[in-house]
């Protein structure tokens, strides 16, 4: 059971109430230890709620170059006491806000710069990074925004000092490739724990991430573990798979055609699909000032509406992209919650198929049939509503205008990745991706240059893997090889020059990290490491594995087990 509430005396509460001039913030109980989760777990509050006006003032004062710094700071005493002191001191002559923060908070430490041994190959460098990126937070400090987890885990790197949901699947691919199945099992166990504790897998293990999830890759994680442990893994995590599905589908039973509820939407024809959603409509604590500035730049929209759409874009993993905006040059035109994403629905199709498989493994044929029926219904809805027949590619659906959107993005490859695409349509997507997104350094996220990081000219490791796997699933091996080879060459050239792997790459050429977005380019980097290892083994034969990218392009991809399109998608 999650440890009990932080108890305070009535006298203390009264004193704080007076100090705050009638403003008393409430605290929910939270765990300082990763204990067995239980149904009476209360949601811990994020720092913007715990610290109220102090949090707002510190972030608006821009005391730190990165707004995430103070969001990750740990109060040294009860936040109510700190707030009371702040109220009493802030108007005094000579008050120094930075000094007050330094006295009352423990700031996150900058990670030590990793200097790899000289002469390492790409594979050796990645294998050497796994222990460097591994963290254990079974116990955390009281009032820390970090949420404890029972097992160790691998973080992305750089400013990302916690585990992230969808990042982790691609990191786990690399861990498995390196033979670290124990770490894969630990990370799956952590996500299962989070589902039991919070009802879903949050964006990351921070209190300020609890109001949203991320692209649902838990089914893929369990399937990966099942490659090593067999159907026992499917049976073990069936309850958590069911809980995650319930989270995404919450409220579907009462929806009428044309209505939406949180993460689920019902179109006019009765088709059920999903969207990204954040339960809160305030600035993100980790990007507080930026979100306030974005909202102020568009006074024609309610700020709360913009905040929720910014948060929901963070839930999508694509924060930010022209994909979510009416005007690619104006972030305040973002409207994530009115868009039905093709990649999200492809992933939920996979979740339904995995639920069917896990139910069958557990001996529940009736449930397996129900999940198969749900998957088939979603596959039909994807083909009906998320296919742009005029352009010839999969795209997002616009709820505001009740029509398919025209923009081609790397998300168009997700139906191929989960084998939910019709074969003729897969061929059209392959041709479109090759013509419009394939660049010298890999697959571009979109063809739009907006200055946002999930747009051109950036390419991201997870999207390269999804594309390569999806194209292979439908026999588009030559295009798959081009994506794989070009991206690996980009990674190798950057590594040769800088001796590191980075979060994203400029794919308009090779050998350059990507730009744009809210923070500087990060290195490490979890998902790039994982995808690079998988791709190295994809282009080199099993009998002669390569430790670095070959200097010449292989004739074809190595034979690897891939998913076969189901009969419904032939």
UniProtKB/Swiss-Prot annotation:
Chief localization: periplasm
Protein name (database record): Periplasmic trehalase
A GO biological-process term: cellular hyperosmotic response
GO CC annotation, single: periplasmic space
Region Disordered: start-end pairs: 545-570
One Gene Ontology term of the molecular function aspect: alpha,alpha-trehalase activity
Signal sequence, start to end: 1-34
Family: Belongs to the glycosyl hydrolase 37 family.
PROSITE patterns per UniProt: TREHALASE_1 (PS00927), TREHALASE_2 (PS00928)
Active site annotation, chain numbering: 319 (proton donor/acceptor), 503 (proton donor/acceptor)
Subunit and interaction comment: Monomer.
Keyword set, alphabetical order: Glycosidase, Hydrolase, Periplasm, Signal
Pfam families: Trehalase
Ranges annotated as biased composition (Low complexity): 554-570
Enzyme Commission no: 3.2.1.28
Record's function text: Provides the cells with the ability to utilize trehalose at high osmolarity by splitting it into glucose molecules that can subsequently be taken up by the phosphotransferase-mediated uptake system.
Compartments it resides in: Periplasm
Catalytic activity line of the entry: alpha,alpha-trehalose + H2O = alpha-D-glucose + beta-D-glucose
Binding site for substrate: 159, 166-167, 203, 212-214, 284-286, 317, 518
């Amino acid at each position: 059971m999650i440890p009990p509430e932080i108890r305070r005396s009535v006298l203390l509460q009264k004193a704080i109430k007076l100090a705050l001039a009638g403003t008393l913030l409430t605290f929910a109980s939270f765990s300082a230890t990763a204990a067995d989760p239980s149904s009476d777990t209360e949601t811990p509050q994020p720092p913007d709620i715990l610290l109220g006006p102090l949090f707002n003032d510190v972030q608006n004062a821009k005391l730190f170059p990165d707004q995430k710094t103070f969001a990750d700071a740990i109060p040294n005493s009860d936040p109510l006491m700190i707030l009371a002191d702040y109220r009493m001191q802030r108007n005094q002559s000579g008050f120094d806000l930075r000094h007050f923060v330094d006295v009352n908070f423990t700031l996150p430490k900058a990670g030590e710069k990793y200097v790899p041994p000289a002469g390492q190959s790409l594979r050796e460098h990645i294998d050497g990074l796994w222990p460097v990126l591994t963290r254990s937070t079974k116990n955390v400090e009281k009032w820390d925004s970090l949420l404890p987890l029972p097992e160790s885990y691998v973080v992305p790197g750089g400013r990302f000092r916690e585990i992230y949901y969808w990042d982790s699947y691609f990191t786990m691919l690399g861990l498995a490739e390196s033979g670290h199945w124990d770490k894969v099992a630990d990370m799956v166990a952590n996500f299962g724990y989070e589902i039991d504790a919070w009802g879903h897998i949050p964006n990351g293990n921070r209190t300020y991430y609890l109001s949203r999830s991320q692209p649902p890759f838990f089914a893929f994680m369990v399937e990966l573990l099942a490659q090593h442990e067999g159907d026992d893994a499917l049976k073990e995590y069936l309850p958590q798979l069911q809980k995650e599905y319930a989270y995404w589908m919450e409220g579907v039973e009462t929806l009428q055609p044309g209505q939406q509820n949180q993460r689920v939407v019902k179109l006019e024809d009765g088709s059920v699909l999903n969207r990204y959603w954040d339960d809160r409509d305030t600035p993100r604590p980790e990007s507080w000032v930026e979100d306030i500035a974005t909202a102020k730049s568009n006074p024609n929209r309610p700020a709360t509406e913009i905040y929720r759409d910014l948060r929901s874009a963070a839930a999508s993993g694509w924060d930010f992209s022209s994909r979510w905006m009416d005007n690619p040059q104006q972030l305040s035109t973002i409207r994530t919650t009115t868009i039905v994403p093709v990649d999200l629905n492809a992933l939920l199709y996979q979740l339904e198929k995995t639920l069917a498989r896990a139910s069958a493994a557990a001996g529940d044929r009736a449930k397996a049939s129900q999940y198969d029926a749900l998957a088939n219904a979603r596959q039909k809805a994807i083909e009906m509503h998320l296919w742009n027949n005029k352009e010839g590619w999969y795209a997002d659906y616009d709820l505001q205008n009740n029509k398919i959107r025209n923009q081609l993005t790397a998300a168009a490859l997700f139906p191929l990745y989960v084998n939910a695409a019709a074969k003729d349509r897969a061929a059209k997507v392959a041709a479109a991706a090759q013509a419009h997104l394939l660049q010298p350094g890999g697959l571009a996220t979109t063809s739009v240059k907006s200055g946002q990081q999930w747009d051109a000219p950036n390419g991201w490791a997870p999207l390269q893997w999804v594309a390569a796997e999806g194209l292979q699933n439908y026999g588009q091996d030559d295009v798959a090889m081009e994506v794989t080879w070009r991206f690996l060459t980009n990674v190798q050239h950057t590594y040769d020059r800088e001796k590191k792997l980075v979060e994203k790459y400029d794919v308009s050429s090779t050998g350059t990290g990507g730009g744009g977005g809210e923070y500087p380019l990060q290195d490490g980097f979890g998902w790039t490491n994982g995808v690079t290892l998988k791709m190295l083994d994809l282009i080199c034969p099993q009998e002669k594995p390569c430790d670095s990218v070959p200097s010449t392009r292989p004739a074809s991809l190595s034979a690897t087990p891939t998913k076969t399109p189901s009969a419904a998608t032939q």
